[in-house]
């Protein structure tokens, strides 16, 4: 029964000290940036009913959810996604729209063993709800670019795709659901040979404009030249409108001076089926995994109430932290500047002194040792060069100068002691 008591479950890990501080700093900087841009905060439970994620389109595989039972035997899950619970809140609470919300929290998904992915990750994100024009997508992309800039993330790019274009192609060519799943993997992985074989095996007419567009889809990534190429092959108004939307978003963001942070990839297809239009993925060149993901989901909120258009972007905090650790100087934990050793009857005075010194920007801690020599040893081990002793009758300051020497003594009040 104690076999696993010293181990972590697959896909999880412990975060210690400096890394914890960095995670917290990233979350708080993202939060501040989003709040400054007018987003309002929403928090949802870590656990949700299974039914929240089990509507008809099944956007998240059941096998990827951590499931258990509540006291009444109902199926509960650790949330595998942040957007769906937010859709539940907006749909059931009848929030006034348009609405801009931000969130941060842990997401849990059971990935395959040895896949190199964590099953528990931290996400911070934004959603713009109730707006169906391109201003919603533009707002989301600008917000995320500015937040990554403030975090000093280097060499990142956000790719803009269009799942509606892919869905139009699939519909026009009458590709069945099971075949579509296979086709999707070929396009996403840019497997040109397998895609060509798929077209041949399906006996699709390679002279047909839609088939030409399908075959070119994995190659349609880059800048506005990609849009021009896709427009030539678009065979329906719906396809043309989908392509034009990507063009409008790209041009608007480029005019703001953020062109170096964006690119187009019309062969990008999100794995979550609730996306209905423009989609996004962000990467840092040095890191393979995505740091940003999201898109438009105009039909999701309707599963919980009124049908409302919406766009969202999620930032993968763990990946941002990993990038910052690689791109920047090693994070140095702020050491304790002063340690206060006190006799129990001088606790109040010691705490007052700690508060006074802290207001000057010092990191000050009360010693946990009853013996002064133990406090000295701890201070040396942790590179603390100043120890203040709160004795029964006075305060004494010691400084390390190859040995502990008295710097000042004699004061009984922490206020006058600090001023000396």
UniProtKB/Swiss-Prot annotation:
Q: Which InterPro entries match?
A: aa-tRNA-synth_II, aa-tRNA-synth_II/BPL/LPL, HisRS-like_core, HisRS/HisZ, HisZ
Keywords on record = Amino-acid biosynthesis, Cytoplasm, Histidine biosynthesis
Q: What else is known?
A: This function is generally fulfilled by the C-terminal part of HisG, which is missing in some bacteria such as this one.
Q: Which Pfam families match?
A: tRNA-synt_His
Where is this chain's protein located in or outside the cell? Cytoplasm
What pathway is this protein said to act in by its record? Amino-acid biosynthesis; L-histidine biosynthesis; L-histidine from 5-phospho-alpha-D-ribose 1-diphosphate: step 1/9
The primary gene name is: hisZ
User: A biological process (GO) annotation for this entry?
Assistant: histidyl-tRNA aminoacylation
**Among the entry's GO cellular component annotations, what is one?**
cytoplasm
Subunit structure, as described in the record: Heteromultimer composed of HisG and HisZ subunits.
Name the residues that span the membrane.
Answer: none
The protein's GO terms of the molecular function aspect are: catalytic activity, acting on a protein; histidine-tRNA ligase activity; transferase activity
Protein family: Belongs to the class-II aminoacyl-tRNA synthetase family. HisZ subfamily.
Function, as annotated: Required for the first step of histidine biosynthesis. May allow the feedback regulation of ATP phosphoribosyltransferase activity by histidine.
What is the protein name given in its UniProt record? Answer: ATP phosphoribosyltransferase regulatory subunit
Q: Does the keyword Amino-acid biosynthesis apply?
A: yes
Reply yes or no: does the keyword Cytoplasm apply: yes
């Amino acid at each position: 029964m104690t076999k696993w008591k010293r181990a972590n479950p697959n896909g999880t890990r412990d975060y210690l000290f400096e890394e914890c501080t960095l995670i917290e700093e990233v979350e708080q900087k993202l939060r501040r940036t989003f709040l400054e841009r007018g987003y309002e905060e929403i928090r949802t439970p870590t656990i949700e009913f299974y039914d929240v994620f089990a509507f008809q389109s099944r956007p998240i595989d059941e096998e990827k959810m951590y499931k258990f039972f509540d006291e009444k035997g109902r199926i509960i899950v650790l949330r595998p996604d942040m957007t769906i619970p937010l859709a539940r809140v907006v749909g059931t609470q009848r929030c006034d729209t348009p609405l801009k919300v931000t969130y941060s929290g842990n997401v849990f998904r059971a990935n395959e063993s040895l896949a190199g992915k964590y099953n528990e990750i931290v996400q911070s994100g934004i959603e713009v709800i109730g707006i169906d024009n391109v201003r919603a997508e533009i707002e989301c992309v600008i917000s995320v670019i500015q937040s990554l800039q403030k975090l000093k993330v280097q060499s990142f790019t956000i790719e803009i795709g269009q799942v509606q274009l892919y869905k139009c192609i699939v519909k026009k060519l009458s590709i069945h659901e099971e075949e579509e799943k296979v086709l999707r993997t070929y396009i996403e992985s840019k497997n040109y040979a397998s895609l060509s074989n798929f077209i041949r095996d399906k006996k699709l007419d390679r002279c047909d404009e839609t088939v030409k567009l399908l075959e070119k889809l994995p190659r349609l990534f880059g800048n506005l030249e990609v849009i021009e190429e896709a427009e030539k092959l678009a065979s329906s108004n719906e396809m043309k409108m989908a392509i034009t939307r990507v063009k409008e978003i790209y041009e608007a963001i480029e005019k703001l001076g953020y062109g170096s942070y964006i690119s187009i990839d019309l062969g990008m297809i999100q794995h979550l089926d609730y996306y209905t239009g423009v989609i996004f993925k962000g990467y840092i060149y040095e890191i393979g995994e995505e740091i940003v993901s999201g898109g438009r989901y105009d039909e999701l909120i309707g599963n919980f109430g009124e049908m409302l258009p919406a766009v969202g972007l999620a930032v993968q905090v763990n990946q941002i932290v990993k990038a910052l650790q690689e791109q920047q100087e090693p994070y140095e934990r702020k050491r304790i500047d002063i340690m206060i050793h006190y006799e129990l009857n001088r606790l109040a005075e010691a705490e007052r002194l700690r508060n006074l010194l802290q207001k000057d920007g010092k990191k000050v801690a009360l010693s946990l040792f009853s013996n002064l020599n133990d406090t000295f040893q701890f201070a040396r081990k942790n590179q603390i060069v100043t120890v203040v002793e709160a004795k029964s009758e006075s305060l004494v300051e010691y400084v390390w100068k190859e040995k502990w020497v008295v710097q000042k003594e004699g004061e009984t009040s922490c206020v006058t002691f600090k001023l000396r």
